[in-house]
Amino acid sequence: MAIKITVKNVANGSTIRMEVEPTDRVSDIIDSAAEFWNKDSGAFVLKKGKKLLHGSDTASEINLLTDDVLEMIPDPEGGI
């Protein structure tokens, strides 16, 4: 069952709506959003609230729900 989420690009304030599967990894969400904004996915991380998300976690492991908003921010550790 698809989960409909919003990803917000904190750098410019724009958002996209995405459908993800419970088995999709956070890294997959970053890749899709970065491709949409023509950015290097390795330079960004996602936050859910105040929590930084790990790329290897799945949507179900982070309890992602329909209408959740994730923030895509520059990787505080510098990215690739």
Task: Give the residues covered by each predicted segment.
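Ubiquitin system architectures
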Residues: 1-80
